[in-house]
Amino acid sequence: MSFDIAKYPTLALVPDPDDLRLLPKESLPTLCDELRQYLLNSVSRSSGHFASGLGAVELTVALHYVYQTPFDSLIWDVGHQAYPHKILTGRRDRIATIRQKGGLHPFPWRDESEYDTLSVGHSSTSISAGLGMAVAAEREGLGRRTVCVIGDGAMTAGMAFEAMNHAGDIKADMLVVLNDNEMSISENVGALNNHLAQLLSGKLYASLREGGKKMLSGLPPIKELVKRTEEHLKGMVVPGTLFEELGFNYIGPVDGHDVQALVATLKNMRDLKGPQLLHIMTKKGKGYAPAEKDPISWHAVPKFDPASGTLPKSSGTLPTYSKIFGDWLCETAHNDDRLMGITPAMREGSGMVRFSREYPQQYFDVAIAEQHAVTFGAGLAIGGYHPVVAIYSSFLQRAYDQVIHDVAIQRLPVLFAIDRGGIVGADGQTHQGAFDLSFLRCIPNLVIMTPSDENECRQMLQTGYEYREGPSAVRYPRGTGTGAPLTPPQALPIGKGVLRRRGERIAILNFGSLLPQALEAAERLNASVADMRFVKPLDDALVRSLAEQHEYLVTLEENAVMGGAGSGVNELLMQLRLPRPVLNIGLQDSFVPQGSQEEIRRDLQLDADGILAQLEGWLAR
């Protein structure tokens, strides 16, 4: 897929930031218009993250115009907004391949470009990494500058404030740009406030401010009076007191879509000493009316027709696992006003929109705060409520200690609804749910379930909800179910699997949603297949029976083989002194790259043909 660059004459002049910095400042608004149109035309034909990038066009241009990237370090938090950055840093011709197998990475990625100083994908890491880079640059002594761009959503995470507290304490030379797209442009964001921002970021003000501090350092009462007066005057037009208390010099808010004003302010701030924070106001989806009106729906998009202004409706008739969870949540809450649903800023992705509307008093979006989400659930359980923490597998990694320390040790009945377990697809290494079974299986007191279809998912959610002896987890994949008929939720017997097919010589022990592939491979081999259902506790009796009746055992899971469900089977067989050859099939010791789920499963030999090939190769040794 290629674009006629002649339709973007100014953009054509800037294949990289060195050329961008040769442009006259007056041409930057035109460049921004063309860059925004280029982004619209490319993402509409390829799919990808959309609204965030539209809102960050002017900021991206201004940063590369003022800072000497890649000599200066530019760090993007999460990376959803970094498509314009990729277009301006030598990857313009490949932007249509983003999120595809072998294409551009969906997020800034160090292996892809020298302009990507930090590989990202998860939230709120930029300031911590940027602080480390700033300290390293200071010791290097070459004048390298560090800039971190973080959104208002990512700023809600504790890690961001931990980093700012540290930066303010050691007075590191760095700039944090707070890209605030939650609110519309306020009255404070206009010519007057832009002018004030340039004054407050100027060298004269900075020198007077620091000189005054030194002069008054021996007069604490006067120094405190001056400090309070300054805060009062700035507070009349800027909401920066919190950041000032953390040790940052706060500038803003300024209009994030006025590229020339941004350039002027950034030039003033580039050489300021100590930690600086520039607060800009932007509009998510800027320049494309449907995305401005509904930035949540247009956050990440499939291919679409820009002229229609609508997103294509899903052609599938099967419900997603996220919807299955959301519907179960509503059904259960209807009969239990003590059920509490918790999400760390993933309402839409986790299927909780309906629940949040129908049961607002039982719904808690705690923002990007996974650690808090888990311990908040622990507190609710102590108070006699029935918490359900809905969280993506890759994000649960961020709350591991809380699962152990605050929930499992205390045997609190918290249900974890773990979405996006296994291969997730196009978002690449940072978002694959590859490790949850491994890092959860070793935690005492925790029941772990892996449904093989959408109806089994409902039954397992009910099982975890009714289980009161400790925490439980139901781990399900991204995507749609198999079409299994839905029956009323009913608790399953804990730690019991089901034999799905009886064969000879070989038994496949399946954990989770690869059951259809296991059954297909088993048909060709005349193998037995067990739907194990529970990773913990294992069905010891079923494993013993299969081991005694078959020559070979195969475990199958969409999780890291190391420490996963198959490892649990191996450990049990050793404990039972049942020496049987076991092949553990799953995700090997490498990070899973981007691609469609089908492509990745085929490449990793987790489709039926691949499972058969792995098994036949193993038997032939």
From Swiss-Prot:
Task: Show the GO cellular component annotation of the record.
Answer: cytosol
InterPro entries in UniProt: Dxylulose-5-P_synthase (IPR005477), THDP-binding (IPR029061), Transketo_C/PFOR_II (IPR009014), Transketolase-like_Pyr-bd (IPR005475), Transketolase_BS (IPR020826), Transketolase_C (IPR033248), Transketolase_CS (IPR049557)
The protein's superkingdom reads Bacteria
Query: Which Enzyme Commission number(s) are listed?
Result: 2.2.1.7
Query: How many cofactor units bind, and how?
Result: Binds 1 Mg(2+) ion per subunit. Binds 1 thiamine pyrophosphate per subunit.
Q: Top enzyme class of this protein?
A: transferase
Which pathway does it take part in?
Answer: Metabolic intermediate biosynthesis; 1-deoxy-D-xylulose 5-phosphate biosynthesis; 1-deoxy-D-xylulose 5-phosphate from D-glyceraldehyde 3-phosphate and pyruvate: step 1/1
One Pfam family linked to the record: Transketolase_C
Name the coenzymes or cofactors required.
Mg(2+); thiamine diphosphate
Gene3D superfamilies the UniProt entry points to: 3.40.50.920, 3.40.50.970
Keywords from UniProt, A to Z, are: Isoprene biosynthesis, Magnesium, Metal-binding, Thiamine biosynthesis, Thiamine pyrophosphate, Transferase
Q: Where does Mg(2+) bind?
A: D152, N181
What GO biological process, any one, is recorded here?
Answer: terpenoid biosynthetic process
Do the record's keywords include Magnesium? yes
What is the protein's known function? Catalyzes the acyloin condensation reaction between C atoms 2 and 3 of pyruvate and glyceraldehyde 3-phosphate to yield 1-deoxy-D-xylulose-5-phosphate (DXP).
Q: Which family does it belong to?
A: Belongs to the transketolase family. DXPS subfamily.
Instruction: Describe the protein's quaternary organization and the partners it interacts with.
Output: Homodimer.
This protein's name:
1-deoxy-D-xylulose-5-phosphate synthase
State the gene name recorded for this protein.
dxs
